Amino acid sequence: MPREIREIKDFLVTVRNKDAKEIRIKKVGKNLTKFKVRCGRYLYTLRVADNAKAAKLMQTLPPSIPTVQVDSNKK
């Protein structure tokens, strides 16, 4: 079940949960970046429209959780 998180602080708290398994980063278009964290029950999604904030958030992610960069497939 997907859940959307709107605040960066809430996303960082969710990423540091014990049941967080994987973080997927997906760039959509020029400015939009989606961060998805798979937890035990839900898939949490954060949308960041600013490239500078997205780059800063990538640096603050915990290294203990595997991070996967996903390419957006445009048809």
UniProtKB/Swiss-Prot annotation:
Keyword Ribosomal protein: yes
Single Gene Ontology MF annotation: structural constituent of ribosome
Gene3D superfamilies assigned: 3.30.720.90
GO biological process: protein-RNA complex assembly; translation
InterPro entries with a match to the protein in the record: Ribosomal_eL38, Ribosomal_eL38_sf
Superkingdom, natural source: Eukaryota
Entry keywords, A to Z: Ribonucleoprotein, Ribosomal protein
GO CC, alphabetical: cytosolic large ribosomal subunit
Pfam families on file: Ribosomal_L38e
Positions of transmembrane segments: none
Family listed: Belongs to the eukaryotic ribosomal protein eL38 family.
Protein name: Large ribosomal subunit protein eL38
Organism: Dictyostelium discoideum
Organism ancestry: Eukaryota, Amoebozoa, Evosea, Eumycetozoa, Dictyostelia
